[in-house]
Design a protein with these regions (language model features):
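A short beta-strand motif that forms part of the nucleic acid-binding face
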Residues: 82, 94, 122-123, 149
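Short, ordered coil/turn segments that flank beta-strands lining enzyme active or ligand-binding pockets
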Residues: 42, 82, 103, 112, ...
Length: 221
């Protein structure tokens, strides 16, 4: 766990909630419903376009900004919602394979370097970083160096008592790893969304959670 320059400024700040026209996470909300209550016109027109280059994730929208990942360049890019002007860029330690989640003035995302990042939405300053991977082992995948236990970009944030382990606080849910059957399995990690501190970790591997025996011990061919 590493505190960033914006940690003290945001730790005690509630931040603005979601607006009706926002789309702050993958598929719009924590239920991944893919729906919105905003009025969407049947006739659309293009307001702006901007060249960013390379593979891009789908965008998310919160307040006056649009956020997306430039996947292979390890970047999170923030754009002005009305003009498309680049507000800031942040370079992470590996590929970011899907859009970030914007929550109460914070931009949260997982990275293929095995970490979860929290940035200040207004300027991209780091708030905190947490290594969800059990160690800092690396390998090469698709011509990129990344963690043995990568974290997918679109982390899930649940708040308002949705997670009993955190009471009324907000929780970041993410998984580090590639498969239950290699490299010691996968790590299901829950973090305090404000402080970045670990709430709990569950190892998902090839052993039965109650007996400790291999899951395929009783499989008959």
């Amino acid at each position: 766990f590493v505190r960033g320059p914006a940690y003290d400024a945001l730790t005690g700040a509630a931040g603005a909630g979601q607006g009706v026209s926002d789309w702050p996470t993958y598929r719009g909300d924590s239920a991944r419903s893919g729906r919105t209550d905003a009025d969407v016109p049947t006739s659309l027109r293009q307001n702006w376009s901007i060249p960013i280059g390379g593979r891009l994730s789908p965008p998310v929208v919160a307040g006056s900004s649009v956020f997306l990942a430039a996947v292979d360049r390890h970047e999170i890019v923030a754009l002005d919602r009305r003009s498309g002007r680049v507000n800031w860029r942040f370079v992470a330690g590996g590929r970011v394979d899907s859009p970030p989640t914007v929550w109460r003035g914070r931009v949260l995302f997982g990275c293929r370097d095995g970490r979860v990042y929290c940035l200040r939405a207004s300027d991209g300053e780091p708030v905190w970083t947490f290594r969800a991977a059990p160690s800092d082992r690396r390998l090469t995948a698709w011509e990129q160096v990344e963690s043995v236990w990568p974290v997918h970009g679109s982390v899930l944030v649940l708040e308002g008592g949705a997670d009993p382990a955190a009471g009324d606080g907000a929780v970041v849910h993410c998984v580090a790893g590639r498969s239950m059957f290699v490299d010691g399995g996968m790590r299901y990690v829950r973090l305090d969304a404000v402080t970045g501190q670990l709430i709990s970790e569950t190892v998902l591997d090839d052993r039965h959670p109650e007996t400790g025996e291999p899951l395929d011990a009783d499989v008959q061919w």
